[in-house]
Amino acid sequence: MKLNRLWFCLLIIIPGFLVAAYLGSHFLTDWYWFAEVGYRQVFLTRLLSEVGIRLGTIAFFFLFFYLNLLFTRKSLHLSPPEGRENWTLKEYLIDRFITSRRLGILYLLLSLAGALIFSPLAAGKWLVVQEYLRATPFGLADPLFGRDVSFYIFKLPLYHFLYKLLITAVVGAVLVTGFFYFIFNPRELLGLRRGHFSRPLVHFSTLVALLFLIQAWGFRLQALDLVRSSRGVAFGASYTDIHALLPGYNILGWVAVACGLIIVLNAFRRNLKLVSAGILSFMAAYFLLVIAVPLAVQKFQVEPNEFAREEPYLRYNINFTRRAYGLDRITIQEFPALDNLTPASLREEGATLDNIRLWDYRPLEQTYSQLQEIRSYYSFKDIDVDRYTLDGRERQVMLAARELDQNKLPDRARTWINEKMRYTHGYGLAMNPANTVTAGGQPEFIAGDLPFHSSAGLQVNEPRIYYGELTGDYVITGGTAAEFDYPVTGEDNFVETRYQGRGGVPINTPWRRLVFAFRFHDYRLLMSNGLTPQSKILYYRNIQERVRKIMPYLRYDADPYLVVAGGRLYWFLDAYTITNMYPYSEPNSGGFNYIRNSVKVVIDAYNGSVDYYLVDPGDPLAQTLARIFPGLFKPREDMPAGLQQHLRYPPDLLSIQAQMLTNYHMENTMLFYNKEDAWSIAEEMVGDKRQAMDPYYTLMRLPGETQAEYILMLPFTPARKVNMIAWLAARNDGPHYGQLLLYQFPKNRSIYGPMQVEARIDQEPRISQQLTLWDQHGSQVIRGNLLVIPIKGSLLYVEPIFLQAQESKLPELRQVVVAYEEKIAMADTLAGALQVIFGTQTPAPAASPQPPSQAATGSPGNLSELIKEANRLYSEAQDRLKQGDWAGYGENLKKLEQVLQEMGQKVAE
């Protein structure tokens, strides 16, 4: 007997201990980690709020169920009648097993079980409560109820939550109390004992009446939800919703109240016909007011005169959708699409031409992998695009972080020591200008290699990457053995290092080693002799996981980008505030109908520090989060200047806005209703597939501006057509960051769209023959992104052509196609293609003053020296032309012009 009890205790204690250890280790390691990253207050706010709401919900359900069960106690017939020989089986069982004490325990257990079963209704609802308490007004009222938009986003969700709790609690109480009454006192529950006050019937009727009263409130909530109705021609309350469904919900609310009163009255009058009539009336009213009448109004009033009926609500939808997606902030300008580009005007736009992105990220990823991974265990997750000031000039570059991918370690090297303590970090980055190419068709790397080296003066004092996109598992630093840093010449030669950063949690006591062993299910953390008092464990190292762990209430961009600033490597991650509760705003394909890029997250690749910068302080959702989590967001002004230079408008956000703009650029309700001026995002060919263009960055001078700036742009075409109608630009630099500009083409002209240019490239005989010839000789032709480049009021179209041999995974940039108006040219370089289209006899460009050369200033020199100088300047100009250096090309031509003038004077003498 004792042995059985021992086994029973072990079966209870051991699983209980394991569950407690698992939960406790997760809590403690999260507690340590939040302290390490400096966000323990965020952790406490979340924890205490979640626990408080969950305990409050459990207490509510427990008390509600328990009090209702206690009320049944006096009404249950637990004492069987005298005359044991006449007892039924039920009466015998009650006498044998049911006592007052046992019933009390049963009530407690049932109430607790019900509370625990229904407590998950509160999961994650703590944020709903906090947002209700700390709501920030939008300063904009909806046109139907006149309530501020913040009511629908921050207040209404809490009311829906409370409604669900109340309905669940009352239904649960009805079922449980009804069961006890039916088992122990069915006659009084059913009102069969006339002339006698029926306590069970009154209790049960009160609960059912309460259910109807709560449902009356539910109808009011459903009425408020009409501002997000999808019934009409546009999102939001439509004519039918307002003139049929809204009155229907209001009437149903009063019908529900009346039914509740009838049911309470029935407990005393016991008129089942009245109750039946009330319930049937409620059901009939629901069918009539929620289904039949709205359907009839829609069919017979709205559809025959749809625009006239829906016109006011279309206007609401247009206005609120434009506000919700920030489309109302777009400045609209005309773009003339001139056809008067000349070599001289091109030279004035040297900064634009010097930064046209020729390298498509898709083939470039393969090139980076082949040329810069260097060892099999390194990987480039993806290629980022940014701008840097290099050698005194702003250049658009492609770059990627060289991360260590432990999954690519050789099998023999995949030991616990190697994965956790030796191969701990990536190293450096690779970078190439977006517009230059070597003679072999490869990118011109201006930064890269191992150890890190930059030919462009890019300074990186700390190239090690402990936190990145491929850093999935934990690692331990400060062990007895040094860490692998990077390989050097020779098969087994490498450099070692020791982590000196601020990241990581100390794991210097047996207790902590035990906690982390449970947390990561890894007994070797307890057994290893490689740990020292200086050892630290680095976890949550994947930057996406890291930021979501701190603040999961923002939506994060899927594509972080690497930034070099102040000699260190940082990750930038765009964070969005979104909601699907914005009234009258059309939802997008992601299910939300409001979005702002209010927060920029910066992660130090070495230390793992995470900073949240609020770049749109006017966003009420971000303001509300800032109130809930004081100190979480830093003002944009606190961001170091070196990081602010790399702020980018997110391509994902521009894509969402552009998709909404295809319809919501039309503010005229008649145009919108008929979709007469609907647009599409311009398409291009990628491989052999036709797909919508992605937004792309470029350095260019916007119309009316004096300096080139970094912009993100995307062209539009009319719906179901291929000619271009407009392009959208987002500014990225300095005080202009976030400004949106929409440039529309003249309505009376047809402007070539990207797909038309793609077709013209295919139809151009020389280009088509050359591409076919390469294909026939075993080379795969890869056509890169077709870029539309606005310049001097005109449009250039540029498409790079890559070749990849069948046996090679190394694409080469071999040709560049340029289209302008009716001309198309393909050449080895962008400069060469421009030369074919615009010719070579061009006047010297306007340039900033340069120190005059001896020949250029007319100082003493004979004719032969001037000829040599002219040849030298011409050769340099051609070299710069091949490199795509238009600014340098223009400078050389100006000097050459001065030398030629000097030669003319010498000849005249």
UniProtKB/Swiss-Prot annotation:
Pfam families: UPF0182. The chain crosses the membrane at residues 8-28, 51-71, 103-123, 165-185, 201-221, 245-265, 277-297. One of its GO terms (cellular component) is plasma membrane. It is found in: Cell membrane. Its main location: membrane. It comes from the Bacteria. It is a multi-pass membrane protein. HAMAP family: UPF0182. This is UPF0182 protein Moth_1139. It comes from Moorella thermoacetica (strain ATCC 39073 / JCM 9320). The lineage of its organism: Bacteria, Bacillati, Bacillota, Clostridia, Moorellales.
